[in-house]
Amino acid sequence: MSAQKPGLHPRNRHHSRYDLATLCQVNPELRQFLTLTPAGEQSVDFANPLAVKALNKALLAHFYAVANWDIPDGFLCPPVPGRADYIHHLADLLAEASGTIPANASILDIGVGANCIYPLIGVHEYGWRFTGSETSSQALSSAQAIISANPGLNRAIRLRRQKESGAIFNGIIHKNEQYDATLCNPPFHDSAAAARAGSERKRRNLGLNKDDALNFGGQQQELWCEGGEVAFIKKMIEESKGFAKQVMWFTSLVSRGENLPPLYRALTDVGAVKVVKKEMAQGQKQSRFIAWTFMNDEQRRRFVNRQR
């Protein structure tokens, strides 16, 4: 097991404060959502979901050449810098086999979401090809609309509906397909009540009353599942064994550090050859992802150099 110290990734484009003047030029809608902090500095009204969406539109257009992006009301509006960090750390993980980041990597995004955020960043930053899976037909339609509205993305991103209840890789990874890595932002609550309580905590932390608009929306499949994050990732680990020769690295975000021990035990049980934990940080927010493989060093080198 190896670990690496936290911090925003060096290649992340979002180290400095947002250049709001430039972002407002990119997306003039953002201007109406600017506010002043108690210190008198200009900021974005992060408690307003329309403001967060307008900021994301500007960031994706300015930094990632995604000119047309939108999501339906009620779906998660992800913070772009944190999502980019996962992609950059994943790139480093893929580079360890050959010493360079593969330019033609094939990545599977489990739960691509209405926002399609990971493929959008990964295609722009590294030229990777993505397959995105999703259980929700509405989320899939939204992601496809984003792909279709931006020239070139149709060649780089394809979407698949997960029709098998409770399945993660089964039904999505086809017989002769190979992926350099999978990624996933799993549902972290174990019930709708727990998800609501989480939103209440965020609301209180922002000093909002319960009627105020929130940017922490999300559909059921985005926020919770039976047994929560640990059960979901354990299921992923269990299924991954069946695709040990088709996928080099399986990865998943883990929202809470205390969830790691049962996941490590599950990885030992399925015979993972190597397990890696990557720590990430954005401001005060700490996050991490775990990665596991069933291939040894030599097998991973051969996998990276395979015919594509």
Curated annotation (Swiss-Prot):
Protein's job: Specifically methylates the adenine in position 1618 of 23S rRNA.
Domain of life, per lineage: Bacteria
Pfam families reported in the protein's UniProt record: Methyltransf_10
InterPro entries xrefs: METTL16/RlmF, rRNA_lsu_MeTfrase_F, SAM-dependent_MTases_sf
Name the record gives this protein: Ribosomal RNA large subunit methyltransferase F
Similarity comment text for this entry: Belongs to the methyltransferase superfamily. METTL16/RlmF family.
NCBIfam families linked: PRK11727.1
Enzymatic reactions: adenosine(1618) in 23S rRNA + S-adenosyl-L-methionine = N(6)-methyladenosine(1618) in 23S rRNA + S-adenosyl-L-homocysteine + H(+)
Gene that encodes it: rlmF
One GO location term (cellular component): cytoplasm
Location in the cell: Cytoplasm
GO MF, one annotated term: 23S rRNA (adenine(1618)-N(6))-methyltransferase activity
